[in-house]
Amino acid sequence: MMSKDQALIAVDAMGGDGGPRVVIAALALALSTDPDLRFRVYGDEALVRAQMDLFPELAPACTICPAPDVISGEEKPSLALRRARKSSMGMAISAVKTGEADAALSAGNTGALMAIAKLYLRMMRGIDRPALTTILPTLGKNGVVMLDLGANTECDMRNLVQFAVMGAVYAQSAMGIPRPRLSLLNIGTEEMKGTEDLRAAAALLRQTEQTAFQYTGFIESDRIGQGDADVIVTDGFSGNIALKTIEGTARFITNLLRRAFSSSLRSKLGFLLSKPAFRLFRVYLDPNNHNGAIFLGLNGIVVKSHGNANVSGIAQAVHLTAKLVRSNLVNCIADDLDMFFSQASNKELQA
């Protein structure tokens, strides 16, 4: 019998660039700091068992579940749906549907993962579409929850408001913020700026009586990392561009500093003196330290890891998944949605 602190995670061992070699090592690392974790590991039995043999401490916490098929990184979602039933990704998500696991984790194909998760778990009552959500680092101590990061290229006013409610609950669960500050991403902070849907969503959020979050208005993209907001809501097109720009800028600055500090003997000496500070800088910008995105709006928890995440990165995603399970995320979102839609002015927003 599982204790209330245990979290049973269905893991797609075949997803990501490193496959079982990286995934199994990550499970061992996560278990070393959280002994209440339990895993159902889906994948090629021989490959998974070979890696498990390297970490005997995993044996009591893991169940190997053979999966004859693998969804590749280039596979179209339509084809992935047809092969989902026997794939490691599909079987992991199915375990959440049947109650064999509390959540699913995969580093595989994002489009396929979303399509299979929507098919198996369905949308929550009151939600039209899922939103790909993650926590980005900021100058503030908590970071910022940002959604949608690419699941929906076009979003109307209703989608944005639904994302706001879900994002606020996620910030409460993942970051422990009782009443997060929430903003809508826009090209300016003035009320007349932005699309009609953005302005309509802003107007509704301003007038809504609720306690889940405090709406603080529009925010521009240059303020994402400043810690001005705890939750930033946008459509998936703008969100994905913003995310890729942030990641690319971080790599650019890191490479620029590396080039600058290797340009001369004096600069190399300067780097040696500054090494502790730059080590902190690298840790802060390393995406492995912030790994893990979730499709909010589904009747279950499905977490997506970066495909190129290393062992510590996937372990970070495991810890995030466990935290969301223990915080009862799905039920908390459902409760807040019911409260939000119970207001007469918001009933037309319900899916």
UniProtKB/Swiss-Prot annotation:
One of its GO terms (biological process) is phospholipid biosynthetic process. It holds the Pfam family FA_synthesis. InterPro entries: FA_synthesis (IPR003664), Phospholipid_synth_PlsX-like (IPR012281). It is an enzyme of class 2 (transferase). It comes from the Bacteria. Its EC number is 2.3.1.274. Its main location: cytoplasm. The keyword Transferase applies. GO terms for cellular component: cytoplasm. It is found in: Cytoplasm. One of its GO terms (molecular function) is phosphate:acyl-[acyl carrier protein] acyltransferase activity. Keywords: Cytoplasm, Lipid biosynthesis, Lipid metabolism, Phospholipid biosynthesis, Phospholipid metabolism, Transferase. Pathway: Lipid metabolism; phospholipid metabolism. SUPFAM superfamilies: Isocitrate/Isopropylmalate dehydrogenase-like. It catalyses: a fatty acyl-[ACP] + phosphate = an acyl phosphate + holo-[ACP]. PANTHER family: FATTY ACID/PHOSPHOLIPID SYNTHESIS PROTEIN PLSX, PHOSPHATE ACYLTRANSFERASE. Catalyzes the reversible formation of acyl-phosphate (acyl-PO(4)) from acyl-[acyl-carrier-protein] (acyl-ACP). This enzyme utilizes acyl-ACP as fatty acyl donor, but not acyl-CoA. HAMAP family: PlsX. Homodimer. Probably interacts with PlsY. Belongs to the PlsX family. This is Phosphate acyltransferase. It comes from Zymomonas mobilis subsp. mobilis (strain ATCC 31821 / ZM4 / CP4). The lineage of its organism: Bacteria, Pseudomonadati, Pseudomonadota, Alphaproteobacteria, Sphingomonadales. The gene is plsX.
